[in-house]
Amino acid sequence: MNYKLKTRSEWLDEYHQGVRYGLQGKLILEESSPFQKITIYESKRYGKALLLDDCWMTAEKSEKCYHECLIHPALCCSTQIENILIIGGGDGGSARECLKYKEVKSIDLVEIDLRVIELSQKYLPTIGGDAWSDSRLNLQIKNGIDWVKHTQENSYDVIIIDGADPIGPSKELFSNSFLKDCKRILKQGGVLATQSESPESFQKIHINIVKVLREIFDYADPMYGSVSIYPSGLWSWTFASMKQQRYMHPKKSRVKEISENCQIWSTRWQQGAFNSIPAFIERELAKK
């Protein structure tokens, strides 16, 4: 992936494979942590935004299009949801969505870069919301790969992989060995959820993620939606489970509990998102 970020007057642009994505606004902060370049930008259209290594990660007024779609197909459908693992997710949005469920007793949020959390809390506090002060949230400033590798089997009901694009510290979150470890520590009846890139801008990566998950788990299926600040605007999330497609069957009690507080996700939306797989992707996934 060839990313390049440039500023032209009041615009901040992300260049990717001959396409330019830009938001108008002003630069607030730019620094380098031990792991990556971090940028905070205030856009006129989407509010404050977070960029990592010059890639748009999240923005105040568009983040629900991403976080609700990553979290609720997993938590509404998993057999149990008491113990949750989030890898990445330093902006707090995934934790916020998980904590909408009263059944959730504990969330381990494993983020490698403390500065992502600190700057998100300071400049984008509405994304994490009350999650940061919720006693059920346990912050672990550690390497997610190592955390999963050294965790006992059958430890979590749901695993959420909320990493950046497969460059920098997030690259190994898409590896075969890491996903096998995730399967090992996921309880029977559990669901794994991961962002799985754009089927248009990152076609090969997207297809590979789904295929690897299908090799490791009994079932894995992508769903598709719109995240306007990401390359092409078309994004995907992939869900995996054993024995049955648990992520296809939301539990009515959980739907009732959280649906009124969702802006994007609904059972109807979820069904449509799973059914909206592009034909060319479906053909590629069918190839051996």
From Swiss-Prot:
This is Polyamine aminopropyltransferase. The lineage of its organism: Bacteria, Bacillati, Cyanobacteriota, Cyanophyceae, Synechococcales. It catalyses: S-adenosyl 3-(methylsulfanyl)propylamine + putrescine = S-methyl-5'-thioadenosine + spermidine + H(+). The active site is at 162 (proton acceptor). It is an enzyme of class 2 (transferase). Disulfide bonds: none annotated. Keywords: Cytoplasm, Polyamine biosynthesis, Spermidine biosynthesis, Transferase. S-methyl-5'-thioadenosine binds at residues 36, 111, 143-144, 169. The gene is speE. PANTHER family: SPERMIDINE SYNTHASE, SPERMIDINE/SPERMINE SYNTHASE.
